[in-house]
Amino acid sequence: MFGMSHDAYLLLDALVTIIGLIVLITRFKVHPFIALIIAAGFLGLTSGMPVEKIVKSFQDGFGGVLGFVGVILALGTMLGKLMADSGGADQIARTLIRAFGKERVHWSMMLAAFLVGIPLFFEIGFILLIPLVFIVARRSGVSLIKIGIPLLAGLSAVHGLVPPHPGPLLAIGVFGADIGKTILYGLIVALPTAAIAGPLFGALVSRYIPGTPSAELVEQIAHEPETQDLPSFGVTLATVLLPVFLMLLKTFADVAFPDGHAFRAWMDMIGHPISALLLALLVALYTFGYARGFDSKKILRLLDQSLAPTAAIVMIIGAGGGFKQMLVASGVGDVIGHLAVNAQISPILLAWLVAAVIRIATGSATVATITGAGIVVPVIDLIPGVNRELLVLATGAGSLILSHVNDAGFWLVKQYFNMSVSETFKTWTAMETILSVVGLVFILLLSLVL
């Protein structure tokens, strides 16, 4: 078409579609949910897909993603809400601060975010934990940026690299990776990466941009928990990490027991992300609810409140899944896969690059993960011996790069930390880029020994 080969046309079509998606979201302020649907429809029509297949492909992608991630998001959000309102998140922060001391308080904030952020989306984790940044800064006298950047790094690293976060879980489903191995490798990569991008970079940049919180905002959100009867550190940690433990146990059972063994069959069910998070939520109803004196009405109200803010996130994720499926069904993914094989590009590097481009284009780490995985997955069949778990991590690392003005997280950080756009680029955007690049380096190093 237009004097081009079919493959070249498909690549150009995909490029034009993604540019159009950027323009719709950034220039015309179209909601990402609507913009993704329009982009998916445009790609389907212009790529030559049969009309009846266009809607079906989008529907399959939308439903396939939400049938899994929608449940994960709801359960994780409920768990996070109970943890925050019971004072569990505050207990983790207080305990780590006592353990690390004032001089190393920024390290404790990274670990607190790392632990608390496991069941939460970045934006939700940010809203739940930002009061702790203000409280700790006030108590310790340490710079807001020196404390805040490590917390943001911990949340972002978990968001992009560690299941049961929805982003990595989506990529696990697309690539057919093992969840237990991905958790293990994700932790190996995420901890040192967050340490470099968080406490180390935060200590450096805070010398030049210390951060001055809005007095009005501090007064509004930096209050102590309503109850001083906080759950213990051990109980909080056990509750939050229960789903991770169950998923790791499933992987152990898959390795240690043969197919058809009763224990393995049970662990396959119990260690499934949905089952694991459901069990953790049921435990949290007691540890973060009834044991703290909350009655059934209050718990029900908290759970209802937790679901309302996730509606937009769920719809955007679903539309991202539909767009991803359109890229696959139109043949764009196969074209890129064959190009990667012919150019002899490392699949890990390709996964990182594709996710990075989509992240910069759309501003959404989750959309970048979904779409990037869908584009790169054909490479698995073309290049034998590819480590699927590292592809998941590479896609997640790429999805974190260069957060800028088309990312809601950029404005969230700017407003809460009372920074100018320039300061936000020098702190938040730089931190996200360090996370992405350093994460890739660790993934490539890990690939040498796996």
Curated annotation (Swiss-Prot):
Compartmental location: Cell inner membrane
Gene Ontology BP, a term: D-gluconate metabolic process
Keywords: Cell inner membrane, Cell membrane, Gluconate utilization, Membrane, Sugar transport, Transmembrane, Transmembrane helix, Transport
TM annotation in the entry: 6-26, 30-50, 60-80, 116-136, 142-162, 183-203, 233-253, 269-289, 312-332, 338-358, 366-386, 430-450
InterPro entries for the chain: Glcn_transporter (IPR003474)
GO molecular function: gluconate transmembrane transporter activity
Entry-linked PANTHER family: GNT FAMILY GLUCONATE TRANSPORTER, HIGH-AFFINITY GLUCONATE TRANSPORTER
Name the UniProt record assigns to this protein: Gluconate permease
Lineage of the organism: Bacteria, Pseudomonadati, Pseudomonadota, Gammaproteobacteria, Pseudomonadales
Gene name linked to the record: gnuT
